[in-house]
């Protein structure tokens, strides 16, 4: 492998700005803003608008719309025979 061409992979804290939920993970993204984590170490802080803590798919607050498929529309239009 070539030296000095790979991005710096480091631990960072992502914070969901909607709920305030934070989680520590590895990333190549950096930030000048830092936060002290539960283990006492300081890590770069990256703010995100949506995470698994606030996304409707993961929270179970998802709204489903009735979407008819082609067959259902055909049967509705011409009646099931």
From Swiss-Prot:
At the top level of its lineage, which domain of life is listed? Bacteria
Q: Which residues cross the membrane?
A: none
Q: Does the keyword Nucleotide-binding apply?
A: no
Q: Is Transmembrane helix one of the keywords?
A: no
Q: Which GO terms describe its molecular function?
A: structural constituent of ribosome
Q: List keywords of the entry alphabetically.
A: Ribonucleoprotein, Ribosomal protein
Its GO CC terms are:
ribonucleoprotein complex; ribosome
Which Gene Ontology terms describe the biological processes this protein takes part in? translation
Entry similarity comment: Belongs to the bacterial ribosomal protein bL31 family. Type B subfamily.
The protein's name: Large ribosomal subunit protein bL31B
Q: Which gene encodes it?
A: rpmE2
């Amino acid at each position: 492998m070539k030296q000095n061409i790979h991005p710096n992979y480091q631990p960072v804290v992502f914070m969901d700005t909607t709920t305030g939920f934070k989680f520590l993970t590895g990333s190549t993204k950096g930030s000048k803003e830092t936060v002290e984590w539960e283990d006492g170490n300081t890590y770069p802080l990256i703010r995100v608008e949506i995470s698994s803590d606030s996304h409707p798919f993961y929270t179970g607050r998802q709204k489903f719309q009735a979407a008819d498929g082609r067959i259902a529309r055909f049967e509705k239009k011409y009646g099931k025979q």
